[in-house]
Amino acid sequence: MHKPRLKFWDIWNMSFGFLGIQFGFALQGSTMSRIFETLGAEKDNIPLLWIAAPLAGLIVQPIIGYLSDNTWHKSLGRRRPFFLLGAILSSIALLLMPYSSAVWMAAGLLLVLDASINISMEPFRALVADKLPDSQRSYGFVIQTLIIGIGTWVASNLPKFMNNVLNISNEAAPGVVPESVRVAFIVGAVVFIGSILVTIFTTKEYSPEQMQKFEDGDEPEKDQGMIKTILGTYALMPKIMKKLGIVQFFSWFAFFAMWTLANPALTSHIYNAPKPQIEEFAQLDSEGELQYDADRVILFQDDQARLEYSEQDKSYNEASDDVGSKMGIYGLSSMAFALLLTFYTSRFAINRKLVHMGSLILGGAGFLLMYFIPGEPEMLYVCFVLIGFAWGSILSMPYAMLSSSVASSKMGLMMGVFNMFIVIPQIIAALGGVVFLQKLIGEESIHAMTVAGVFLLFAAFSNLLITDRKAIKYDPA
């Protein structure tokens, strides 16, 4: 028995929750390093502060995958209970994040936010495989990418929109997150839970009995318990997953470098507007600690120092708004890429491997170009358009290739285990990998973007390892 083909709006509605998920990820990706810098973090320490995000994924993803494979709620079904739980927790974390008063607080909330986003996200990947026949899976993952692109662009532009259009200030006292960023996070929280509710109320799931019929009546494997099942899946990983894992490793190392270091790298190299160090302008005691007045306001050396700090901080915040806005372009170009693939894959067969390889090469070129355009911020549009092609492919092609090679009954667990190849490179990068490689090239943080470009090229050519014909090609007929 085969699953029926779904109409466009059915696939759109079941993927719509990804809009909120991407609002969370995009606000995190475009503003967290800015928040860390605002709270006093050193540039070289920023990747380490991000380690909470991949650690949460490493632990949460396979557990949620297993639980969602083995859950059935009479009203919410198999995957939707996790959509709702993750949305509630993520929205709370988004509301609290911009009100952090210390680096440790922001890092802790980042852990909560990323773990909560993963609770919602992993079942969404599995839902595509649950609901769609193999001939529509690339189509389904591409529509998810289309929605992700919309979310990335809108969310990345929110702080700049709040300042330029709504006249909400992007300036604040030292150590305080600007009001424009705070309001952007509040909007993100509302969109997150709202879009998830759209999917919950418009999408029905197949029952376990129906899923068994779609598996040609095969008896489901006996459940051996969560820990044993997860460890067994790691041990008996399909070859296609291992090969795709190499591609994913290089891809996600590159994007982690972008999320953590693009803001300090580009504000310094392209805009010549680095974050000013408050210690250079404030009064310090004999031990080098900041001095405060009775209201806990930092004391400056004199009025001239206060003015210079304010001007430099204003330039930094304006540059950060612009970097975040231009980063959103990669969401738009990934959306355009997804739209093109949506129409094409609904009618014609594609070679997934070659599509993914070509997209990653373009993304690598986008990162490498950044080094050669100091003082030319408009050229960042070109860079992020190219990066968006890679991002659009990363969010769809590997999952489409994998889902064609594993059973639907284990799809949630497989997707969770597969994401090990997403979080491990990020952990390595956070523990000093990206900063170490950057400093092999030079001290300037822009070299982190060069590292990202080289790693995307490694990812592109790693696709040559993939030989599974079922994973590489599919026909919409």
Model segments located where?
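Helix-loop boundary and gating motifs at the non-cytosolic
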Residues: 2-54, 243, 247, 251-275
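Intracellular loop-helix junctions on the cytosolic face of multi-pass helical membrane proteins
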Residues: 1-9, 101-108, 117-120, 124, ...
